[in-house]
Amino acid sequence: INGTSYAIGGLQGQPVENFFLEKWMANLKPYPNAFQFEQVEIHAIKPRLNWKKRPEWMSVDQPWPSPGKEVVFTYKHPKLEVVVQVHYEIYDHMPVLSKWISILNRNDGAINIQSFTSEILACVEAESVVDDKINWEYPNMTIETDYNFGGMSSDNILFTSVDWKIDSLYQTQVNYRLQTPVTLEVAPKYGPNIQLDEGEEFTSYRVWELLHDSRDQDRKDLEKRRMLRAVAPWVTENPIMMHVRSAETEAVKKAIDQCAEVGFEMVIMTFGSGFNAEDDSPENIKRIKGLVDYAHSKGIALGGYSLLASRKVGGGNDVVMPEGKTPRFGNSPCLESHWGKQYFDKLYKIYRETGMDILEHDGSYPGDICASTEHPGHEGLEDSQWQQYQVIQEFYEWCRSEGIYLNVPDYYFLAGSNKTGMGYRETNWSLPREFQEIIERQNVYDGTRYKTPSMGWMFVPLVEYHGGGEAATIEPLKDHLPHYEKRLANLFGAGVQATWRGPQLYDAPATKQVVKKWVDFYKKHRAILDGDIIHLRRPDGRDWDGFLHVNPWGKEKGLVMLYNPLNESVQRSIQIPVYYTGIKNKIKVEWPDGKIEFMEKNEKGRIELEVNIPADGNIFVLLEEE
């Protein structure tokens, strides 16, 4: 604050850092010039943002906020009229802690908050290594924040808002150079460097800390996905989507009609369609509102695409990078420039006045800093990231409060987005169709380790995309119906939604029947398909592949989905880890032909299924409790 660093509470004087003995407590001393503890309060958890649920896209009604308690510690300084509160949230039935700080200025004038560190957590080292290492193993925790950007996975958190650091006090560690990363610090890489006027309050971003009880990868992945469903439950909304390639009125109406016929739930006027979210003219708003009303009359949600980052807008409105640095995507406007303010004004206006339900926000804000001193929304470099992030976070929170679905190719889940890319390479759609089938399943298999099925979208261009010609293209759909059905089975069988991009979903009665078959399959088993995935065998083209869907709270507690890429049927004995289904007694096994069998799990919590998977086909097996 105003150039001086202050500790918030805390004691010092511990003789060694390897362990702590209670008898040392009496000899510890406060940090000099620190804020001092005043009081502690316990409250019910309050929602950090308003969420208008879309139950038609959810298989389970998730509570909001997540049940638990908030604990607030208040600290004051003997010489400053500044109050600091340290907030914790603890949740029912989860080893998860959330933490953030708030600062209230009671001075007669403004203060400047240059930086903050909202968490300093000394942890037991994950490994005890004498020698130098390039890639250290970190303590067994999952860390998330709502200040994370610049990529589709949470790994970017180390570049935005947290760090694992060495502890200079830990002189008794094994590592010769004292380089073991044992201290978690939560702090922005820049700023915030903001002015806090008299009576104003500053609130930091939040961190969530999930403590794992095992290094078993499946168990850790389950724990992480459960945490995300609890603290960002809008990720469980999983609408069935189509990307219509043209935003012309009749093209959009055709897409809406076809979606309604086969059970799709959402139409997105995609990139390159001609939809312009920045056109807030009365004529455009009137036309789009007419399309929205038409879609709603058919039970279909409608919205469109807007590009934010990776574009150059000129006029002094682009980010000004320090020497030697470039924007994340080569070009980017500054969100706090004159253009940025007008851009968001237009988005608010067109979504308010048309009632659109979905925004596909490409690039989003990737965290680019800006050294300009001419932009109206920030002072210079040090506050530029913080101020730009506030703009995007406030907009996404508004979208959540309005029930506007957010497809964002960035990791904004905890700030309000619903879905990001599952993980794929776009140029793979120029490969022959038969190659795409297995690669698609690999992408789903890998992506659902770290995401729930509803958190990641896949992409299926029905028309030519990135080249490849006829061999790579699904249109005409009726001419490539077996391949089209495999793609439907790949994705609906995984509970993963794709953006099916083209002018139509079907072009013949037989095509329509196949699409409806798999939509009906997903809707019939939505609760289990939206549940967690236990990975059985990764696709490699050499044998069967598949996974086990689990939902311990549902009637259908398990759904085994198996695929055969070979040109001959395969008979296999497959171990199924039914432990994860929560079934305690006998297991009712329902085979694809309707045959019922009862089985008991072994001492490892598994059953053995003797399966016959047809050539170049798939099967699913349902598991229930007797």
Locate predicted features.
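Active-site-proximal substrate-binding groove within the catalytic cores of carbohydrate-active enzymes
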Residues: 392-595, 608-612
